[in-house]
Amino acid sequence: MKLSLAMLALGAFVVAGAVVAVGTPGPTPVEIAGPVVKLKDKSGHGSGVHIGNGYVLTANHVLPGAEKSMAYLRDDGRKGTAKVVWGSAEYDIALMKLDTYDGIAASNLECRAPVMGEAIAMKGNPLILENITTWGRVAGTEISMGPWASVIPVDGAIAGGMSGGGAFDADGDLIGINVGMMIQQLGLGSSSVGISVIVPGSAICGLLAR
């Protein structure tokens, strides 16, 4: 959730010397929505990250099948429509375009793979919650695993609805897209093992350059 800080101008009042110093309020800060959006359709929801000029990165499995657009919700409450530009099932990455992008921050995409032990923050909209951040560290090196051509394991939590959200480094730069978590089958049920996977920025930049 975005925290807006209201700045109050402080003034001093000295009675004995009849000197009054009055602070003049500064301009009201302009509200800028964060870069992570919620993407929704009739079957469910995921997340996406605005990288500039209305373009949003997300996970390919978040896309709505035959439909070419999804509704989106910004963290400032504004809504709109995002259209599919392209998707890669091999890498589980897709690019969408917002119908309007005024007043929304853009993430700086780093074309690199996070390194072992690096601190990482993962943002998205898990389950019934919105604008959630979880923290962890890079737990392994870049690998091909299951349906993903290139992912990096991290020890932070990713839950359903966070797919397509961003993985950010200590400087706030986008270094990956959340795509899944590892599940262990336990009899008739299953349990998360605490390891999630992200597609690294290096692979994403390779797709964008095609």
Regions found by a protein language model. Give the residues of each.
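Generic detector of low-complexity/intrinsically disordered segments
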Residues: 5-12, 97-100, 210
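Active-site region of chymotrypsin-like
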Residues: 26-43, 98-106, 130-209
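Conserved active-site neighborhood of the chymotrypsin/trypsin-like protease fold
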Residues: 34-36, 43-45, 50-124, 128-132, ...
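Protease-domain processing segments flanking chymotrypsin-fold serine proteases, especially trypsin-like
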Residues: 2-43
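Small side chains
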Residues: 11, 17, 71, 80, ...
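Residue-level detection of beta-strand scaffold positions
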Residues: 10, 120, 174-177
